[in-house]
Amino acid sequence: MGEADRYIATGVLKMKTSYVGYRALLVHAHPDDETINNGATMAMYAALGAKVTLVTCTRGEEGEVLVEDHAHKAATLDDLLGEHREIELADAMAALGISDFRFLGAPDFKYRDSGMMETEPNRRTDNFWNVDFERATSQLAAIIDEVKPHILITYDEIGGYGHPDHIQAHRVAMAAADNSSWKIPKIYWNVMPRSVIQEGIDAMAALGSDFMGVDNADDLPFAKDDSFVTAHIDGNDYVEAKMAAMRAHATQIAVDGPFFALSNNLGLQVWGNEYYTLVKGDKSAPFDEAGREVDLFSGVELS
C-alpha cells in the first residue's frame, strides 16, 4: 500500500485516504517549534496529499547552541546561528515532506529572535517582540490570502510556555486571520494534555530518569487540563519522519537530551500523538472514544 493510500483508523473511525485539495497553514516562532509540536501531523497530511505551508517568524538567533562544533555561531559570539538554523529548517522540512516553508516578512524584512523576557536581546528594536505589529499582521494576512488555508495551527495566548516570540506569533496569527480576506474555516492551538505529560514523567521516573527535572506535570507551564483537548492526531505511522526532522534541528535538540530520552525510554509513540484545541470552527466527526476530533480537516468543505 502506497503512502497516498494509507489511512489512520481507530476502531471504525477513519480519516480520508486522500487530502488532495486541502490546505493547512502553520505559524511558528522559531525553527524546530514546528517539528516538536506538529511534525507528525505535518508529515501525515502532506503524505496524504494536502498542501502544508509553514510560516516561521524568526530564525532563532538567540537559541542555545547544543553542538560544540557550532558553539561559535551563538548570538554572543559570531552571531551566525540564525543562518545555520535556516539550513536545519530546510533539512527538517525535507524529512517531513514539506516544500512550502517561509519566513515571515521575507525577503524584505527579517524579524530577529527576541530572547526571553527582561534579557538584553528582548530590548532590541529589530526583534519580533518589538515588531511593527500592523506590518507583521499585514504580511501574514497576505500569505493567508495567497494560500487560502482550510485550517490554521498556532500557539495559545501564552505561546505554550511564555516565550515572547511564541506569544507574538499567536497574536500576529490570530490578528492576520481576522484581517485577511480569506476566512479560515478552522483554527487550532497546540496543546499538551496534562495526563499525557504526567504519564511520561511517571514512566521516566520508573526507569530512574526524569523529564526536565520535574516530577509533576503541573510544574510545566505547557501542561494543560485534558478538558482543553478537542482533537487528537494519531500520527504514529509518520513518527519516523518526525524523529528525522528533530535530528535535523541538531543545534537545538540534543540526541542525549530530554526529548530523545522520552522516545528512547518510552517508545516513538510518545512523539506520534499530537493534540490540539479548536478555537474557531465547528467540531466535527469522526471522534475518538474521548469525543475528540481525529481529523483536523473534518467538516471542511473544499473551496
Residues covered by each model-derived region:
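A structural signal for short, well-ordered beta-strand segments and their strand-loop junctions
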Residues: 54-56, 102-105, 151-154, 162, ...
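Hydrophobic, aromatic-enriched interface-forming segments
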Residues: 150-180, 185-195
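Active-site rim/loop-helix segments in enzyme catalytic domains that contact anionic ligands
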Residues: 4-148, 175-179, 277-280, 285-289
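C-terminal accessory domains and tails appended to enzymatic cores
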Residues: 4-19, 116-117, 178-303
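Flexible glycine/proline-enriched surface loops and loop-helix/loop-strand junctions
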Residues: 124, 153-157, 224-229
